[in-house]
Amino acid sequence: MAVPGCNKDNVRAGCRKCGYPGHLTFECRNFLRVDPKRDIVLDVSSTSSEDSDEENEELNKLQALQEKRINEEEEKKKEKSREKIKLKKRRKRSYSSATEEDSAKQKKQKYQKKEKKKEKKNKSKKGKHHKKEKKKRKKEKRSSPYHSELTKK
């Protein structure tokens, strides 16, 4: 019926990594992760005290290398962001100077166009006024007493 050694009372929950009861797997301190990105794990419980000094040195070297890599990556990211900012500033400066030159040219062109239009209007007005004045003179000549005397004779 029931197997004699499989009672709940006899089975203790223990660590799956090291097998010791009293702590769970996520609480295990007998294993160290060398690289958090990779699954490299060192078993501390199985090492002797003589080997621990050597392994500690190796661990320290590995951790130092990791820190260097992380620092280098962060520095690269910072440099890239700085370069982007510099490029944006350069673009803005060059863009603004180009627009100032363009806008100055455009303003000159607009001013010249306005002047030409004014000149054309003045010429056309002069012509119109001149024609009106001619008509008035003709009417005056016809209605003038001297003109009427000449026509009667």
From Swiss-Prot:
Biased composition, class Basic residues, residue ranges: 85-94, 106-141
Xref: Pfam families: zf-CCHC_3
Residues annotated with Phosphoserine modification: 52, 96-97
The entry's keywords: Metal-binding, mRNA processing, mRNA splicing, Phosphoprotein, Zinc, Zinc-finger
Molecular-function GO terms, alphabetical: nucleic acid binding; zinc ion binding
InterPro entries the UniProt entry points to: Znf_CCHC (IPR001878)
Region (Disordered), start-end ranges: 44-153
Bias (Basic and acidic residues): 66-84
Zinc finger (CCHC-type) in chain: 13-30
Entry keyword Zinc: yes
Gene Ontology annotations of biological process type: mRNA processing; RNA splicing
Function: Possible splicing regulator involved in the control of cellular survival.
Subunit structure: Interacts with SREK1/SFRS12.
Protein name per the record: Protein SREK1IP1
Organism of this sequence: Mus musculus (Mouse)
Classification of source organism: Eukaryota, Metazoa, Chordata, Craniata, Vertebrata
Gene this protein is translated from: Srek1ip1
